[in-house]
């Protein structure tokens, strides 16, 4: 989860988020090199006393500043497209969970089970126990098995919402009348927090998401107790 004054991303807990962090570093390195080159050229232009008033064209320079940006864009686009297709790829999910956005709470349905569904509301600040997080705790957590591919079906009952869990690299719009899907796989157990990331009304800030990733055996015990 995020911490006060944190400058970086949250710790990655899924293969997709790890790829996104690598892509971020790759792109930031390219941006840093371009910025350094531009600043260096500007400093040379401001400090040099040489002028070239008779120069009308420079085909070699024009060729370089046409080809070089194209190469840079390709170096950014190729890994970006690779991650984009990885995020859309869903191969034989072990579990499917349907998520519906409401004003202002989430409801979840485990479609592989006959009658396993519940609503998830934020716990008011006045009801929090010591050690619990303000505006992030819910009365019903989404319990999921770790190290297994899980498909999330996401939609909305009323207005636009967005189901987002940063540490898993997930952010999918919940649109009324449309069913979007995303896949997640967690590499380690734990609690992972998210929030609605689309302004949806006066209580938009009070729609937290809490995923509890547990080993498969613990998930089976939990699902049996819920039925």
From Swiss-Prot:
Keywords: Copper, Electron transport, Magnesium, Membrane, Metal-binding, Mitochondrion, Mitochondrion inner membrane, Respiratory chain, Translocase, Transmembrane, Transmembrane helix, Transport. Residues 1-14, 88-227 are mitochondrial intermembrane. Pfam families: COX2 (PF00116), COX2_TM (PF02790). GO terms for molecular function: copper ion binding; cytochrome-c oxidase activity. PROSITE patterns: COX2 (PS00078), COX2_CUA (PS50857), COX2_TM (PS50999). It catalyses: 4 Fe(II)-[cytochrome c] + O2 + 8 H(+)(in) = 4 Fe(III)-[cytochrome c] + 2 H2O + 4 H(+)(out). Binds a dinuclear copper A center per subunit. Belongs to the cytochrome c oxidase subunit 2 family. The chain crosses the membrane at residues 15-45, 60-87. Residues 46-59 are mitochondrial matrix. InterPro entries: CcO_II, CcO_II-like_C, CcO_II_C, Copper_CuA, Cupredoxin, Cyt_c_oxidase_su2, Cyt_c_oxidase_su2_TM_dom, Cyt_c_oxidase_su2_TM_sf. Its cofactor is Cu cation. Cu cation A2 binds at residues 196, 198, 200, 204. This is Cytochrome c oxidase subunit 2. Component of the cytochrome c oxidase (complex IV, CIV), a multisubunit enzyme composed of 14 subunits. The complex is composed of a catalytic core of 3 subunits MT-CO1, MT-CO2 and MT-CO3, encoded in the mitochondrial DNA, and 11 supernumerary subunits COX4I, COX5A, COX5B, COX6A, COX6B, COX6C, COX7A, COX7B, COX7C, COX8 and NDUFA4, which are encoded in the nuclear genome. GO terms for cellular component: mitochondrial inner membrane; respiratory chain complex IV. It comes from Neotamias cinereicollis. The gene is MT-CO2.
């Amino acid at each position: 989860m995020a911490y006060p004054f944190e400058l970086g991303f949250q710790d990655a807990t899924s293969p997709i988020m790890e790829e996104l962090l690598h892509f971020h570093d790759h792109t930031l390195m390219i941006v840093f090199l371009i910025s350094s080159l531009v600043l260096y050229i500007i400093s040379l232009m401001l400090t040099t006393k040489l002028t070239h008033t008779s120069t009308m064209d420079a085909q070699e320079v024009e060729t370089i500043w046409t080809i070089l940006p194209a190469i840079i864009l390709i170096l950014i686009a190729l890994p970006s497209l690779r991650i984009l297709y990885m995020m859309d790829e869903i191969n034989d999910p072990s579990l499917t969970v349907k998520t519906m956005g409401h004003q202002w709470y989430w409801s979840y349905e485990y479609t592989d089970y006959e009658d396993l569904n519940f609503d998830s509301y934020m716990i008011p600040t006045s009801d929090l126990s010591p050690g619990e997080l303000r505006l992030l705790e819910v009365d019903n957590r989404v319990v999921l098995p770790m190290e297994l591919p899980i498909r999330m079906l996401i939609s909305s009952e009323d207005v636009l919402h967005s189901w987002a869990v940063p540490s898993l690299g997930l952010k999918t719009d919940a649109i009324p009348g449309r069913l979007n899907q995303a896949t997640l796989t967690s590499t380690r157990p734990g609690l992972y927090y998210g929030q609605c990331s689309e302004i949806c009304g006066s209580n938009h800030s009070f729609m937290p998401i809490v995923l509890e990733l547990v080993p498969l055996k613990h998930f089976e015990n939990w699902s049996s107790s819920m039925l």
